[in-house]
Amino acid sequence: MPYSYTEKKRIRKSFAKREDVQNVPFLLATQLQSYLTFLQADTATSDRVNEGLQAAFSSIFPIVSHNGMARLEFVSYALGEPVFDVKECQQRGLTYASPLRAKVRLVLLDREVSKPTIKEVKEQEVYMGEIPLMTGTGSFVINGTERVIVSQLHRSPGVFFEHDRGKTHSSGKLLFSARVIPYRGSWLDFEFDPKDVLFFRVDRRRKMPVTILLKAIGMTPESILAHFFDFDNFELKSEGGMMEFVAERWKGEMARFDIADRDGKVIVEKDKRINAKHLRDLAAGGIQRVSVPEDFLYGRVLAKNIVDPDTGEVVAHANDEITESVLNAMRAANVRDIQTLYTNDLDRGPYISQTLRADETADQMAARVAIYRMMRPGEPPTEEAVEALFQRLFYSEETYDLSRVGRMKVNSRLGRGDDSTGPMTLTNEDILETIKVLVELRNGRGQIDDIDHLGNRRVRCVGELAENQFRAGLVRVERAVKERLGQAETENLMPHDLINSKPISAAIKEFFGSSQLSQFMDQTNPLSEITHKRRVSALGPGGLTRERAGFEVRDVHPTHYGRVCPIETPEGPNIGLINSMALYARLNEYGFLETPYRKIIDGKVSDQIDYLSAIEESHYVIAQANAALDDEGRFVDDLVACREAGETMLTAPGNVHYMDVAPSQIVSVAASLIPFLEHDDANRALMGANMQRQAVPCLRPEKPLVGTGVERTVAVDSGTTVQALRGGVVDHVDADRVVIRVNDEENVAGEVGVDIYNLIKYTRSNQNTNINQRPIVARGDKVAKGDVLADGASTDLGELALGQNMLIAFMPWNGYNFEDSILISERVVADDRYTSIHIEELTVVARDTKLGPEEITRDISNLAETQLNRLDDSGIVYIGAEVSADDVLVGKVTPKGETQLTPEEKLLRAIFGEKASDVKDTSLRVPSGMTGTVIDVQVFTREGIVRDKRAQSIIDDELRRYRQDLNDQLRIVENDQFDRIEKMLVGKAVNGGPRKLAKGATLTKAYLADLDRWQWFDIRLADEQHAVVLEQAKESLEQKRHQFDLAFEEKRKKLTQGDELPPGVLKMIKVYLAVKRRLQPGDKMAGRHGNKGVVSRITPVEDMPHMADGTPADIVLNPLGVPSRMNVGQVLEVHLGWAAKGVGYRIADMLRDERTAQAKSVRGYLEKVYNTTGSSAHIDSLTDEEVLELANNLKKGVPFATPVFDGATEEEIGKMLELAYPDDVAARMRLTASRSQAWLYDGRTGEQFERPVTIGYMHYLKLHHLVDDKMHARSTGPYSLVTQQPLGGKAQFGGQRFGEMEVWALEAYGASYTLQEMLTVKSDDITGRTKVYENIVKGDHVIDAGMPESFNVLVKEIRSLALDMDLERN
């Protein structure tokens, strides 16, 4: 495979044993695809499918008025262009959204005519609110912040059968139940009680016998019994009767009388059990009917009503038990043939018959009234109301919707095939079939459903969630429209008078702004963004709650394989409820997760890839990805490890249907980034996956020496890097932008053949980390579509780089790495390896107050000159100023209310003038504990307020940048066009031209070069055709210029119009500070294997343990952190990292040699490194220059990829170590024979340690838990209102709680004065603490403790219990 522009520069050596059959799919496809389908913005109206907005509109419209004389029909909708782009929305705090306009038609019918005739039709476009748009990276900008809508994993609509696991009844009897869950509408439950009577309930209300529901849908007791039971046929005799003999019904029963054959020979004696031999004898005897005694009939249940043939009178009802009197009545009425229900105790229970007895309703109407009373207790049941309610429950499309998924699940569970054909409401057949399946379950046939099976849980994505909200808004609109439609004809209203878009906007706004599933995007680094968008949550509206979710829901299920990651999930209360999609997983049309498999055709593994959902997968036998194959793709082993229906087994290759696509198929993105994951304990892998998302981007990102090969995919798919949209040549590069002249073949005619990529510079992320893009191409480079042009935060040459590669030694060091502490060399800090930039946004607003407007100004009294020096004339800090806590950033004064003045103040005012004191200083200052550099200032001014100088200069800068972009585009377009014109003109004959060009002369290059290029258009060509082409070229150039001028004007208009600010705000100023955070003790760090720790000390380089050649270790870790935690992956990573670095050193040595032989020797060595083991790299496809550039990039270490579950073996690591450290080098560095340990020396004494130490390189991360954010101290500060105790927490500038255990400690030491001070003046003794403060100021250190306020609170609380408690004061 050919390498891309960036891959060539640094090829990652992979240890994978298998070729990739399928590339990792685009990681944000689920989100983007779902929202695209929801909007269908670029689809022609006629081609739109019934999904998303289209579905919502067509389900609500047409809206018909109450009298049916007017209706509002939906025609189509269109989305407008958003006013501001993503970046502008973020700056201005706006929502990135498009206006939605729907074309609706108002149809009025003629009242005068008997049959419906249309009187008039009015069509109009109506504004329906704003619909937020998704950015290219799958997030939304809502009120200026980036948010993500997390997908929800909920229980799929359909029918489910389960039992209570014997928990309800003390006997431990299994009570079966069924539940029909629609997408929207009432839930219908069926359940058995301990007495085996079957009940139903609607929406978890009071339960009623199920036969009420059956009667309500139009069944009679006879038809109910006929539906659920088989019958026994009897012919009555004067004594006893004859029974039709059905052999299988007698097997295993006790004979209650002698059974004889035709000749009267007794085959089964009384009280004997009937076995198979007896039945064979009876069949051989040709017995069709058996004579039964009278008492055999008693207790049987009639299947049908018994009617007297003469009088028509009902002698006995269906479901009546046969007694002596009933038999006599039937004989008296000359009834000969009767049918009874066939039941037994084993697998034909009489449940429906018993239920029918418990049901007291007589007919269909009575049954429906009973249901009405249950649903609407206390309301009088009129016939219309009863009918309407019953229809609305399950049969009306407005109130009940199974959805396609629900219909498909119902059909497949009730055994009607897997398609979604059928009505979207419930049918009588559905209800009957469900009850039938439930009764069969109770009879011991069939299986209950597993709720946690991924075939019974589906994913609702952004599009679907947004559609539901939009529909909810439309329903509110529908009610209002129905009211007004009646007036439409009388008042001559237009559609826009009827529709109010507020409810829609409100519903959408509420969903995107404050829904549980709309989350503030985790933007610490590219991985956290991508993981957040691939997250699947079981919480949220219509989902589970943390408190109610049991162990089963959270547990890993066999169907998670390849669909949901078994590793990555949060620790804590949400464990197992929030999951991450697996690497290759995708959603099918019904919203079920699918995973890809390779199909096996005739015993051969093909490259055909099929996606299977959890339900489909259960029908196949699937081999693992690491099964050994021969060259033809046949299995080598006689027995292959496979999975079938969740069970693992060994089977013959002939039985296998599919094979996994890749070993990393089962894990998520974050877990697939952990090298040697297969050697880590799952708990630690979970922590590793979670902590990578918290890694802070370093100042200089460094690729991991040991990766897994997924790094490039993550970096590119996350959108942090800049990718070329079209191939071409780099025309211009600077730190801010990359300009590319597009290849002719990729350019569309009439478009500008220039792509300009403006890079994001020092921008704040949601977590205050720094997003900054750096170009990695040079002028003149040829790039192809999709190549990486610029690195973003945490990426290095287009690969994810979350941390730094550190030289790590595993050894104890003076207790400084006790309990996971980390000892770090000062060199790491000096080299800024873990320095990160954090950007803080500070905002100040100038409001219009009752006493007058606040003013942004430099003119502030009582401010030192040093403070004012940083402010410009407008009172705003300069960019580049270095500021620390309490420095003024923006000067602001607020008018102060008039106060009563003392005579002295009046005198002073009279002498020194009025002005100074009627305003107070409310400037924006740097918060405590923060120092940094001002990197950007933005000023927003309300429409109609005069801009200050600073705001104007910001706008001018922005316009200058934009003009430069346009000029670049124009320059390239013009050069391009003039090159083509020159080619056409040279050698052509002319009729004349500038500089007295003679008629008939031929044009030369020299002549054209002398002219100004715009004068070329004045040349009169002899050939008419060419003259036309020349004229067209001139027109097209002038048109382009005009287009660019228009674009500039548009931009200028946008920038100079006033900003939309909250009511009452005149100006808003945002100041951005860049804060440099160096590594310091107290910062949390971690590797990728869950090996986390806190920096305990930063030690001078000279004190660190060092190697024989003087190389000091960067980090010293405690070896005891490895064995008990079972994350051995970190040790293997260290070994492989050591090899990677060593190979880099060898390459560097070669490059130091003479230039000539370099390429050849380097090429030979690289072949050895890349192609001895693992998958091969195509070094031979590179030119000598490319090989040398590659070698130069590899000097600091060759990056290795050891894919998850398919990584480097111990043997391969050993081979690499030998390549990296030949014997002479190993001896010089005093490495052990295996090269995996080295003899180290104590930096302080120079002595050798007593045993060799494991040393090597590990990719180590600095996490977002920085001590700077947590460090906090309080002198005096705010107090709680009721208890008057100091508040807690850094945000409230609170104190540290002196809790009861601390009090015990002081009591134990007898430190009574300290204790008194803690509980009174330092806490809630109001008078005491003011007194102490005064005393300290005077230099008098005495405390005078009084009554703590919380004691008064206690007294008040006791009084509230009506106990009058008072203190005796002496």
UniProtKB/Swiss-Prot annotation:
CDD domains: RNA_pol_B_RPB2. Pfam families: RNA_pol_Rpb2_1, RNA_pol_Rpb2_2, RNA_pol_Rpb2_3, RNA_pol_Rpb2_45, RNA_pol_Rpb2_6, RNA_pol_Rpb2_7. It comes from the Bacteria. One of its GO terms (biological process) is DNA-templated transcription. It is an enzyme of class 2 (transferase). Keywords: DNA-directed RNA polymerase, Nucleotidyltransferase, Transcription, Transferase. GO terms for molecular function: DNA binding; DNA-directed RNA polymerase activity; ribonucleoside binding. GO terms for cellular component: DNA-directed RNA polymerase complex. The keyword Transcription applies. It catalyses: RNA(n) + a ribonucleoside 5'-triphosphate = RNA(n+1) + diphosphate. The keyword Nucleotidyltransferase applies. Its EC number is 2.7.7.6. Belongs to the RNA polymerase beta chain family. The RNAP catalytic core consists of 2 alpha, 1 beta, 1 beta' and 1 omega subunit. When a sigma factor is associated with the core the holoenzyme is formed, which can initiate transcription. DNA-dependent RNA polymerase catalyzes the transcription of DNA into RNA using the four ribonucleoside triphosphates as substrates. This is DNA-directed RNA polymerase subunit beta. It comes from Bordetella bronchiseptica (strain ATCC BAA-588 / NCTC 13252 / RB50) (Alcaligenes bronchisepticus). The gene is rpoB.
